[in-house]
Curated annotation (Swiss-Prot):
Belongs to the TrpA family. It is an enzyme of class 4 (lyase). Keywords: Amino-acid biosynthesis, Aromatic amino acid biosynthesis, Lyase, Tryptophan biosynthesis. Its EC number is 4.2.1.20. It comes from Bordetella bronchiseptica (strain ATCC BAA-588 / NCTC 13252 / RB50) (Alcaligenes bronchisepticus). The alpha subunit is responsible for the aldol cleavage of indoleglycerol phosphate to indole and glyceraldehyde 3-phosphate. The gene is trpA. Disulfide bonds: none annotated. This is Tryptophan synthase alpha chain. GO terms for molecular function: tryptophan synthase activity. The lineage of its organism: Bacteria, Pseudomonadati, Pseudomonadota, Betaproteobacteria, Burkholderiales. Pathway: Amino-acid biosynthesis; L-tryptophan biosynthesis; L-tryptophan from chorismate: step 5/5.
């Protein structure tokens, strides 16, 4: 199965099961440690993740709130950069050839590696999609083409401030799914206005004909359910990382990885159970 096929297949499985939305957890590669990342990814899949977003640590993460920033800092302190992230994806692929993995990060590490070299390395590692926070869609046609040539989906962010023209532009180049940022500001901030999200998704779907995931501000089962009633995927990052952070802080020095992984799996499973109660419209009973 090729990389872009894995994303489509994941959303197809969700639909065939009658579920309203896919569950996409976000973690920072290398947090709580490089050794924990691959076991953590497998634990998230066991908990019910349909796709996994893997953050590439960067020293100036302008779109990330304090929780995700701390995770990136911990990873960088342990020597995790883009090349190590690709190695971790390849390690994950040895035991899981089904679950899509999407890298989320910033342009600088990709530019240092070279766009074409990165696209080829991502494909070789088993990456399914790439979301670069600070690449505007009107400037990335060449990079998107390189990714597509390598079978990797270029994924883009949309925000409450996105104009219809920008939505239309992204609809032309995005593959896999698009990620709607439900709040203004950084990750982990604010509270959700579900009605506003629903209105914006209706506008997005006029121009975007692939699944639309929603993230930012989803912190518990109730908010996940509200978003799942409207979105094709629910993306959860800050609260998941915070849950691991707290579990690790309470564990002994030699048990921090295990405690963080167990807490993540348990917490994400509660979200998956909540999402399973939200059924897709016209789904079989």
């Amino acid at each position: 199965m090729t990389t872009t096929d894995r994303i489509a297949a994941a959303f197809a499985r969700v639909s065939e099961a009658g579920r309203a939305a896919a569950l996409i957890p976000y973690i920072a590669a290398g947090d709580p440690s490089p050794q924990a990342t691959v076991p953590l990814m497998h634990a998230l899949v066991r908990a019910g993740a349909d796709l996994v977003e893997l953050g590439v640590p960067f020293s100036d993460p302008m779109a990330d709130g304090p929780v995700v920033q701390r995770a990136a800092e911990r990873a960088i302190a342990q020597g995790v950069g883009l090349r190590r992230v690709l190695e971790l994806v390849a390690d994950f692929r040895r035991d899981d050839s089904v679950t899509p993995v999407v890298l989320m990060g910033y342009a600088n590490p990709i530019e240092r590696m070279g766009q074409r070299a990165f696209a080829q390395a991502a494909q070789a590692a088993g990456v399914d999609g790439v979301l670069v926070v600070d690449y505007p869609p009107e400037e990335v046609d060449e990079f998107a083409a390189m990714l597509a040539e390598a079978g990797v989906a270029p994924i883009f962010l949309l925000a409450p401030t996105s104009t219809e023209a920008r939505i239309e532009a992204i609809g032309r180049v995005a593959r896999g799914y698009v990620y709607y940022v439900s709040l203004k500001g950084v990750t982990g901030a604010g509270s959700l206005d579900t009605d506003d999200v629903a209105r914006k998704l209706a506008l997005i779907r006029r121009h975007v004909h692939i699944p639309v995931g929603v993230g930012f501000g989803i912190r518990d089962a109730a908010s996940a359910q509200r978003i799942a009633a409207h979105a094709d995927a629910v993306v959860i990052g800050s609260k998941l990382i915070e849950t691991m952070e707290q579990a690790g802080a309470q564990a002994g020095a030699d048990q921090k990885n295990e405690a963080a992984i167990a807490a993540a799996q348990q917490w994400l499973h509660t979200i998956r159970l909540a999402l399973d109660d939200v059924k897709r419209e016209n789904a079989p009973a």
